[in-house]
Amino acid sequence: MLPRWLRGLWWGGLLAGVAGPVLAQAAPPAPLAPTLALHTCRLKDVEVDARCGVLRRPLDPARPQGVQIDLHVAVLPAVARRRQPDPVVFIAGGPGQSAISLAGPISQLMTRELNRRDVILVDQRGTGQSAPLRCDDDQPTRTLAETMDPAGEQRVLQACRARLQKLPYGDLRQFTTPIAMADLDAVRQALGVARWNVVGASYGTRAALEYQRQFPARVRRMVLDGVAPADMVLPQSFATGAQAALEAVFDDCAQDANCHATYPNARAQWQALLGSLPRKVTVAHPFTGQPETFTLSRAMLASLVLPPLYAPLTASALPLAVLQASQGRFEALVGLGMGAMGGGRGLGLATGMHFSVICAEDVPRMKPGGEATLTDFGDFQERLYREACRDWPRGALPPAFYTVPPARAPVLLLSGAVDPATPPVHAERVAQALGPKAVHIVVPNSGHGVMNLGCLRDVVFRFLDEPDDAKAQAQVGADAACAAKMPRPPALLPLLPPTAASASQGGAR
């Protein structure tokens, strides 16, 4: 799974399991056209039967007769007998998340779309059951020092990389986004689909943009939620995005009467807490309850604060957690951070695939001494990724991968105004590059991933369902007006009266 100091940096969801072997072996001559036989299957948390199948693809596109891998595909069938010919294909985030494992949440998210359109889920190569590149390092009851120790995680990654490279499909250069999107179009062909509606979330937006770059004629509509274009350099962007999201927490608290009365010096307490590190702390483990003493560093603190910022609901607990930490009580902060990371069990990401993508597509473009060093979060993520990617095999990329050509089909881009991972500035750049076919909606008081919030589900449905392209674009603005009323959750207040809760205003001690 993804190392613990990186969990929470990438979009995740509720996880389901899908069984099935993955084969990788010398293959017979490839057929002239891909074939994909579907059979009835049951997916966890999906109420109706789905249809599942496997499409064989070459591991190395340059060697079509060489080692083959199996791409696992699931189709959630439309309810109506007369279904629309253009299904929805959902591209999961990460990088490293299985789309099929999210079948339950996706079926709930796209309930209206499923009335008349199939929803297609493909486990991208390296994820789920499609030549999985997983690292078996999930031990929820590890000590806190082990859980947040970057050096220890680097050793785990090195061992995992060595193991993965021994797999029959262990050429880690063959898991880049451009290759994966060629796989996706092979699935489209095998299903006999002329055009489809492409929906991507977080890293899935990068993949969707790459799919459109390679196969523009095959896209009917596109929805991008939490936009992470190829030129974003993911490890470097998090510090500035997280800083802006944290400042928004403090600003909102200062403007809210109850929050300000309870936490009048929240920002100062945070700064004092940072200034007190590194320091030895004693914390009860959130899962075992056993007290543990370890040295808390700024990097560890940042890794705990970042995950709650993804959702304003969890971020609303940060003023209380910071107050208690400034008083020497770190249980709330540790519990909040680890809970947002997946409860110590990760977010279901295939670590090997994650690094095969980031090490090839992002790390070579990282520049030292960037804006991250000026933030409270620092450049620890950059340094960790540089070290992890130092010996990781890197796939080749076409120069055009980092470009966004004008869109031929309507594109809806969605951003959360306080998203620490994919702030709206990136979607705005992409919208300008896509041209007049693109519409960008920024949802106030929202974090990473907004498509499932309130009226946004209906906005997406109407955008996809409208037969006329011009009308689909024109009505989005009016439909999305409901998003302007999205409230920010109020700050979590302690059980004690404000005067007692805020008695310690002098910072860390």
Please report, for each region that a protein language model flagged, where it lies by residue.
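Helix-loop "lid/cap" segments that line or gate small-molecule binding pockets
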Residues: P307-P308, A360
